[in-house]
């Protein structure tokens, strides 16, 4: 929707299944490239999970998504098929087969509170987690502490409708089971490394200054 423009729509069936907001009011975009279609195809480049996202976007564009067994979703993206809109997908440092780090990150969500504390001091909305569909939006006059407490205890973290699941080993395996390679798209995958080999050993350790995420 950020590319083409329009109101984000998570689909009636999907929204009902996970009890999320189907059309978050603050996710309506003008579009970076409104003319995007089969006559004006694009190249997608995704870093980290962005590689998975690009592949999923192709799936949503080229498959009919149903509201129920008989009725298509009432959405241009979900209820119709758009082929040949993507020329290539390039992923950079994307864990297409999942990463064990996903479980570590999920369990250390409370660590975010430290950063949000800073955000509270400087009075910024930078740490909006862009999860309005789950209700992860700071309410009027809600303190940062209350906001984080509400977020940490949300049921979203235990569902498959969250990034930590998609990036996990099991989640990536499930995604790969239905995201098929398209004969109309060129695929490129660029790998990276931030480790160095220990002298006199076969072990590799993180390079100095490497971030955990």
Describe each region flagged by the PLM.
Residues 1-42:
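Active-site catalytic motif of lipid deacylating hydrolases and related acyltransferases
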Residues 39, 53-60:
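Long, hydrophobic/aromatic-enriched structural stretches that serve as scaffold segments
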Residues 44-46, 92:
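Short beta-strand immediately N-terminal to the catalytic nucleophile in serine-hydrolase-like folds
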Residues 46-50, 54:
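Gly/Ala-rich beta-loop-alpha elbow adjacent to hydrolase catalytic centers
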Residues 59-213:
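Helical cap/lid subdomain of alpha/beta-hydrolase-fold lipid enzymes
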């Amino acid at each position: 929707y950020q590319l083409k423009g329009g109101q984000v729509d998570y689909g009636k069936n999907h929204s009902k299944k996970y009890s999320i907001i189907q059309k978050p009011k603050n996710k309506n975009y003008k579009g970076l490239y409104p003319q995007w279609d089969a006559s004006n195809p694009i190249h997608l480049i995704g870093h980290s999970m962005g590689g998975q996202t690009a592949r999923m976007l192709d799936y949503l564009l080229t498959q009919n998504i149903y509201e129920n067994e008989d009725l298509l979703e009432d959405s241009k993206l979900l209820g119709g098929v758009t082929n040949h809109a993507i020329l290539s997908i390039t992923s950079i440092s994307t864990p297409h087969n999942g990463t064990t780090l996903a479980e570590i990150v999920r369990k250390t969500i409370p660590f975010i509170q430290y950063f949000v504390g800073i955000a509270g001091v400087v009075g910024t909305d930078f740490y909006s987690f862009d999860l309005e569909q789950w209700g992860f939006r700071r309410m009027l006059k809600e303190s940062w502490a209350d906001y984080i407490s509400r977020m940490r205890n949300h049921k979203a973290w235990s569902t498959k409708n969250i990034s930590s699941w998609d990036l996990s080993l099991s989640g990536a395996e499930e995604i790969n089971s239905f995201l098929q390679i398209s004969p109309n798209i060129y695929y490129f995958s660029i790998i990276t490394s931030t480790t160095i080999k220990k002298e006199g050993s076969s072990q590799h350790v993180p390079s100095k200054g490497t971030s955990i995420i």
